Amino acid sequence: MTLLKWALLFFVISVVAGILGFTGVSAASADIARILFYIFLVIFLVLLILGLTIFRV
């Protein structure tokens, strides 16, 4: 769950930087948040599939 929290933190940084006019920081933070979110999503889907197939009792 920590990875998702980091993604949300970088999203908030991106929004605040965008509001304040720091477009370079905003774009970089948005890219980091997007990458972390997709990593979290892939890990979640892999564990979901493993939980439904291999680790079934």
UniProtKB/Swiss-Prot annotation:
The keyword Plastid appears for this protein: no
Cross-referenced Pfam families: DUF1328
Keywords linked to the UniProt accession: Cell membrane, Membrane, Transmembrane, Transmembrane helix
Gene Ontology, cellular component aspect: plasma membrane
Regions crossing the membrane: 6-26, 35-55
Subcellular localization(s) per the UniProt record: Cell membrane
Membrane topology: Multi-pass membrane protein
InterPro entries: DUF1328
Family the UniProt entry places it in: Belongs to the UPF0391 family.
HAMAP family: UPF0391 (MF_01361)
The protein's name: UPF0391 membrane protein BRADO2787
Organism: Bradyrhizobium sp. (strain ORS 278)
